[in-house]
Protein backbone atom coordinates (compact mmCIF):
# COMPACT_ATOMS: atom_id res chain seq x y z
CA UNK A 1 0.00 0.00 0.00
CA UNK A 2 1.51 3.24 -1.12
CA UNK A 3 0.70 6.46 0.63
CA UNK A 4 -1.19 9.06 -1.30
CA UNK A 5 1.02 11.89 -2.43
CA UNK A 6 -1.26 14.72 -1.39
CA UNK A 7 0.57 17.32 0.60
CA UNK A 8 -1.11 19.34 3.27
CA UNK A 9 -0.61 23.03 3.47
CA UNK A 10 0.71 24.33 6.75
CA UNK A 11 -1.88 26.10 8.84
CA UNK A 12 -1.63 29.88 8.70
CA UNK A 13 0.13 31.23 11.75
CA UNK A 14 -2.03 33.20 14.11
CA UNK A 15 -0.50 36.36 15.50
CA UNK A 16 0.45 35.84 19.11
CA UNK A 17 -0.93 38.54 21.34
CA UNK A 18 1.33 39.00 24.35
CA UNK A 19 -0.14 40.52 27.46
CA UNK A 20 1.87 42.74 29.73
CA UNK A 21 2.22 42.08 33.42
CA UNK A 22 -0.14 44.38 35.32
CA UNK A 23 2.20 44.61 38.28
CA UNK A 24 5.22 45.56 36.16
CA UNK A 25 3.34 48.24 34.23
CA UNK A 26 3.34 51.85 35.39
CA UNK A 27 -0.19 51.79 36.77
CA UNK A 28 0.52 48.67 38.84
CA UNK A 29 3.85 49.77 40.32
CA UNK A 30 2.33 50.89 43.61
CA UNK A 31 0.08 47.81 43.91
CA UNK A 32 1.38 45.08 46.19
CA UNK A 33 0.29 41.46 46.16
CA UNK A 34 -1.12 40.66 49.59
CA UNK A 35 -2.99 37.57 50.74
CA UNK A 36 -5.55 39.78 52.51
CA UNK A 37 -6.57 41.49 49.24
CA UNK A 38 -9.13 38.87 48.19
CA UNK A 39 -10.73 41.08 45.56
CA UNK A 40 -7.45 41.20 43.63
CA UNK A 41 -6.73 37.49 44.13
CA UNK A 42 -10.17 36.42 42.88
CA UNK A 43 -9.32 37.82 39.45
CA UNK A 44 -6.54 35.22 39.21
CA UNK A 45 -8.70 32.25 40.24
CA UNK A 46 -10.93 30.32 37.83
CA UNK A 47 -14.57 29.47 38.49
CA UNK A 48 -13.47 26.03 39.65
CA UNK A 49 -11.10 27.52 42.22
CA UNK A 50 -7.85 26.90 40.35
CA UNK A 51 -5.09 29.46 39.96
CA UNK A 52 -5.06 30.72 36.38
CA UNK A 53 -1.97 30.03 34.28
CA UNK A 54 0.63 32.66 33.53
CA UNK A 55 -0.11 32.53 29.80
CA UNK A 56 -3.75 33.32 30.56
CA UNK A 57 -3.19 36.14 33.04
CA UNK A 58 -0.18 37.67 31.30
CA UNK A 59 1.84 38.03 34.48
CA UNK A 60 5.62 37.81 34.55
CA UNK A 61 7.26 34.85 36.30
CA UNK A 62 8.00 36.61 39.57
CA UNK A 63 4.55 38.14 39.99
CA UNK A 64 2.83 34.87 39.04
CA UNK A 65 4.77 33.17 41.84
CA UNK A 66 3.76 35.93 44.25
CA UNK A 67 0.10 35.54 43.21
CA UNK A 68 0.26 31.76 43.74
CA UNK A 69 1.81 32.13 47.19
CA UNK A 70 -0.73 34.79 48.19
CA UNK A 71 -3.65 32.62 47.01
CA UNK A 72 -2.32 29.62 48.94
CA UNK A 73 -1.90 31.73 52.09
CA UNK A 74 -5.41 33.17 51.71
CA UNK A 75 -6.81 29.65 51.38
CA UNK A 76 -4.98 28.58 54.54
CA UNK A 77 -6.49 31.48 56.51
CA UNK A 78 -9.95 30.74 55.00
CA UNK A 79 -10.21 34.01 53.09
CA UNK A 80 -10.54 32.10 49.80
CA UNK A 81 -12.12 28.70 49.20
CA UNK A 82 -9.95 25.72 48.24
CA UNK A 83 -12.45 24.73 45.56
CA UNK A 84 -15.68 25.90 44.03
CA UNK A 85 -18.89 25.14 45.91
CA UNK A 86 -20.88 24.38 42.74
CA UNK A 87 -20.84 20.94 41.16
Swiss-Prot record:
InterPro entries, alphabetized: Ribosomal_bS18, Ribosomal_bS18_CS, Ribosomal_bS18_sf
Pfam families: Ribosomal_S18 (PF01084)
Record flagged with keyword Ribosomal protein: yes
Entry's Gene Ontology BP terms: translation
A GO MF term: structural constituent of ribosome
Keyword RNA-binding included in the entry's annotation: yes
Listed GO CC annotations: cytosolic small ribosomal subunit
PROSITE patterns tied to this protein: RIBOSOMAL_S18
Annotated keywords: Ribonucleoprotein, Ribosomal protein, RNA-binding, rRNA-binding
Domain of life from the UniProt record: Bacteria
Known role: Binds as a heterodimer with protein bS6 to the central domain of the 16S rRNA, where it helps stabilize the platform of the 30S subunit.
NCBIfam families listed in its UniProt record: S18
Family: Belongs to the bacterial ribosomal protein bS18 family.
HAMAP family: Ribosomal_bS18 (MF_00270)
Complex formation: Part of the 30S ribosomal subunit. Forms a tight heterodimer with protein bS6.
Protein name (Swiss-Prot/TrEMBL): Small ribosomal subunit protein bS18B
Native source species: Mycolicibacterium vanbaalenii (strain DSM 7251 / JCM 13017 / BCRC 16820 / KCTC 9966 / NRRL B-24157 / PYR-1) (Mycobacterium vanbaalenii)
